[in-house]
Amino acid sequence: MKYQEWLSEWLENYVKPSSKPKTYTRYAQIVESHLLPRLGGYELDELTPQLLQHQIVDMGKCGNKRTCKGLAPSTVNLIVAVIQESLETAYSIELTKVYSADKIKRPRIEEKKVECFSVAEQKVLEEALKNDKRPKTFGILLCLYTGLRIGELLALEWTDIDFDKREISISKTCHDSRDELGRYVRFVNPPKTSTSMRVIPIPKQLMPLLRETKKKNDSRYVVGNGERIISVRSYQRTYELILKKHGLPHRGFHALRHTFATRALECGMDVKTLSEILGHKNPTVTLNRYAHSLMDHKRDMMNRLGKLFI
């Protein structure tokens, strides 16, 4: 059996029934864009470790068909995962004599530096959002003070907020993806991990603004458009326009979450509590991601200690 035939069967009968739509769509895109053109014509038993490794290295050098530039290591690693999953399934049902994809060497991914807003930039952004007063833009402020991901924010309904207890319950997230006809649609699903399903306390200073926003908003969603969820791309654009209007540096929406975490550590919040609020798998993930913030905090504490004696 040729790899292209198996990939089609694998996607339809193995991935689709057991995966979220987002995962299936992403896998299908990888198969269509990268695996079929390069490996689809080979028989399954012709996919040797040497051949697979050669193709993976080549994707890192010139895998983008449009620009002829290399693909990002994270993208290449996802392609490797699809190759390995598809061939492991083929081996398990005896379509191939050996499983060779486990010998692929993955590209190393450099840890990206966490981007966040400085205290001065945060003050400018907060003031801009408070003066804006649109229910739609209040969500940006909410992320800045709770660490919500953009998908969690857009899927958030007013019924998820307990005004008496000052708590937000996170039980779903939304994302934009293509359906089987190639159209962009919005999917709402439970979070990927159980730790992402969590309850977040709301800072009491935010409650008056939250109540005011609810009075002006007739949508079931906190930042929605009537009964419809705002698309991720549309909301990112709203956020980018606010940054541009107020002379703030361009930073991705996730910088709001990083800013929340950084400020929380600077204020002395313990890592375990922060990890639970962010919905991380465990505190080690939080420590690894925000080690630089902890070091800055440690340095400040040591300087304060030095002032007592020197």
Give a label for each model feature.
Residues 69-73, 77-79, 92-98, 102-156, ...:
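Basic, Lys/Arg- and aromatic-enriched nucleic-acid-binding interface segment
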Residues 303-309:
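Short, basic, alpha-helical segments at the C-terminal edge of helix-turn-helix-like DNA-binding modules
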Residues 29, 120, 179, 203-249:
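Active-site/catalytic core of tyrosine-dependent DNA strand-transfer enzymes
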Residues 8, 12, 46-49, 61, ...:
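Phosphate-coordinating loops and pocket residues in cytosolic domains that bind phosphorylated ligands
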Residues 103, 119, 155-212:
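Conserved tyrosine-mediated DNA breakage-rejoining catalytic core shared by Y-recombinases
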Residues 74, 92, 141, 145-152, ...:
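C-terminal catalytic core of tyrosine-transesterase DNA break-rejoin enzymes
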Residues 174, 207, 278-303:
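Catalytic-site neighborhood detector that most strongly recognizes the C-terminal catalytic loop/helix
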Residues 3-4, 11-95, 111, 229-234, ...:
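N-terminal core-binding DNA-recognition domain of tyrosine site-specific recombinases/integrases
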